[in-house]
Amino acid sequence: MANIKSQIKRIRTNEKARQRNKAYKSELKTHVRKVREAVTAGDKETASDALQVASRKLDKAVSKGVIHKNQAANRKSALAKQVSGL
């Protein structure tokens, strides 16, 4: 445990950010999973709708600093490729 007051505050702040990022990443995984499930089911309309939502969530995560922009681009590209393959 830190002894310096500013470091104690940073530990608290970092923990809050970690919890926030964890929740956001969990939400991202849920939306990506919905796209993949729609693709495996062969439902093109649902898959394209889910892809649109997932892409929006990925972009939002980038703007909030939760994930890197290249990671979001790679995920969106892979999902779009799967959906277009239907």
Curated annotation (Swiss-Prot):
It comes from Beutenbergia cavernae (strain ATCC BAA-8 / DSM 12333 / CCUG 43141 / JCM 11478 / NBRC 16432 / NCIMB 13614 / HKI 0122). Keywords: Ribonucleoprotein, Ribosomal protein, RNA-binding, rRNA-binding. Residues 1-25 are annotated as: Disordered. Belongs to the bacterial ribosomal protein bS20 family. Gene3D superfamilies: Ribosomal protein S20. GO terms for cellular component: cytosol; small ribosomal subunit. It holds the Pfam family Ribosomal_S20p. InterPro entries: Ribosomal_bS20 (IPR002583), Ribosomal_bS20_sf (IPR036510). One of its GO terms (biological process) is translation. Binds directly to 16S ribosomal RNA. Residues 12-25 have a biased composition (Basic and acidic residues). One of its GO terms (molecular function) is small ribosomal subunit rRNA binding. This is Small ribosomal subunit protein bS20.
